[in-house]
Amino acid sequence: MRKFEYTVRDALGIHARPAGLLVKLAKTLDSEITLSKGDRSASATRLMALMNLGVGQGDVIAITIQGGNEARSEQVIASFLTEHL
């Protein structure tokens, strides 16, 4: 299991466009990816669950990666977050 945190920089937080791209990306990876904010969490493959986290600009999210090639999945997700959020 790998974990890391990311501070959201996008002015709109996690909204439809980047959430949709994240879901599409997560479905191509062989790891289970979960995003958490506070005591709420959501699978990175579920669009509405991600949007319901209510992540805004400046919020810190925790990303947990389990199974498959965790190191590769972490690199891919970290790169996506930096580029899109």
Residue locations for each model-derived region?
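Compositionally biased, low-structure terminal segments
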Residues: E5-T7, L81
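Compact, glycine-rich, soluble single-domain proteins
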Residues: T7-M48, N52-L53, Q57, I65
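Intrinsic-disorder/low-complexity, polar/charged segments enriched in Ser/Thr/Lys/Arg/Asp/Glu/Gln
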Residues: M1-E5, V60-A62
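C-terminal structural segments of small proteins and small subunits
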Residues: M51-L85
